[in-house]
């Protein structure tokens, strides 16, 4: 890559990989739960559930994503893991974010509950296992899996700024 392009990419990274830029971004939700977890007020599973849904909702205008994630976490009483494990989810054919309906959220909650009944963390799941087992999508070797890879980046990479780095057993 030529030096000018590298310099431009680094400049953009310095501008956009900044907490200020991400205050109104889907990562704000798992970040909030990671901060609560660090203080012992929530657990890693809260961070994981928040990351699953924030990544799932991460398409469209950021202001809409943040608004709709806020509605979702209000429904969860800001205790996402407890909400999932209770097994009583809002299950309506009404949209919560764009084309995502509450019934789809309930289905993901059901798969998360089933997973967490036998496992401590989502960290060991492959991209395909997450795609099929958590998001309920068909296997597709050619799928870009953008939301899953974005979520994994949040959870694995620890840049000291934006990404959380809470999954310590996975190398970035």
PLM regions and their residue ranges:
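HhH-family (HhH-GPD) DNA N-glycosylase catalytic core used in base-excision repair
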Residues: 1-172
